[in-house]
Amino acid sequence: MNLYIRNNTFWFELENLTRLFFPNEKINVYREFQSVEKPFILASLDDEITVSVAIGDFEAEKTAPVCADNGENELSTVKLLYQILHDFSGIDQPWGLLTGVRPIKLLRKLRAEIGTEASDRRFLEDYYVSPEKLRLADMTEENERRIIELSRPESFSLYVGIPFCPSRCSYCSFVMASVERAKKLMQPYTDLLCEEIRATGQIAADLGLRLETVYFGGGTPTTLSPEQLDQVLGAVNSSFDLSACREFTVEAGRPDTITAEKLFALKENKVGRISINPQSVSDEVLQAIGRKHTAQQFFDAFELARKCGFDNINTDLIAGLPKDTAEGFRRSLDAMLALDAECVTVHTLCMKRAATLTQDGKTLNREEAATAREMVRYAQETLTARDYIPYYLYRQTRMVGNLENVSWSKKGYESLYNVYVMDETHTILACGSGGVTKLRDPDSDFLSRVFNFKYPYEYIGRFDEILKRKSDIKRFYCDLHS
């Protein structure tokens, strides 16, 4: 698909919107051109806004008046393109023309500016969001708001990254290393990670920051040995003041990494919340996506975690997986409810460019989108009926069916960290490879980022640079108070 932009700077939103309707096609963006070539979209801003589309035998053009507000001109242009592509495809996008990661944050911002009624009307009439998704957004925003209000100006959360997994799932694009390839890196990485944690803890103490939540992600943190887990968790406990900490989560995502010894190491180090993620309870689906464990291993790991005293367990499912069906997804969700999991997170398959599913030529089609929407609809209806509440929602590009990821929990079991990181409520200090520290000015929306190296071998080989970058944290807070 060729996207031609004339006399405007709206190419980013127009490209993202085009990708909603043509997820498998390369989109070529031209801002300087002499002529256009089919199939094309032409968006121009002259005496009026004009959007023209020509795809095969289909041709259409729509116009709108130009106004003084460039933001409104951009919205008008995107709306015109959405209307034409909707007419061409017959597809009702659940989130309309919204393509951003954080629709709940947008809704909250609009409510603060123009009120609830006007912001809901904006979602429905200007953004073409479906009534069903607006209701979901309304519920999520209300539940998020209660969590956000717990944060103080001096609050922060800690993220610790463990970039190792037993194997790579076919839908995954995260930077991580499989155990068989990276075993020799694990102990050196662990030792240096503890050093970074200690340095970060000292900075937080010097600045008088208040630790609200701790989150171990990855990768799969429980890929580490019990001794290594104890080493890293112990570094957190000895380096930070956890007296005000409301939540300590560890992703124990892969059932094939979970043992009693590791669970005891978590318990001994004040971890109160874990995730054990089946993705599906169909062995055929698990095999198709490269998960080298069985459904029974998940059930065994969940039971073991209960026996070890964990009473706040999240489970992840993915709608739209290869080989899965609507009935298969229903069985998976019903199994999570039968286990009485405190939290069920329903992801939608995202075809990321770095994932092997995408590299192997897997494409999105309308039938798969319809199936994924049926799965997500069943999850929302069933979880709501069982008194689970949506408290965390985000979206990604190239999601099957243009859907969303939603965490549902029993009341009182929401993950605070998930809300804080997605809303960008307060500072997140990150340790480990791939970590991104986000420093937030509590009096504004201003964010400053400090990046760690992505790969474990880089992290180990250039660790001195990681420590030097920590000075940016103190500099940020000193500048706030100068």
Positions of PLM-derived features:
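A C-terminal junction/extension of Radical SAM enzymes
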Residues: 27-37, 354-431
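Radical SAM enzyme core and accessory elements
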Residues: 1-116, 126, 147, 193, ...
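Beta-strand scaffold of nucleotide-dependent catalytic cores
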Residues: 161, 275, 344-348, 419, ...
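Short beta-strand motif preference
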Residues: 51-53, 160, 276
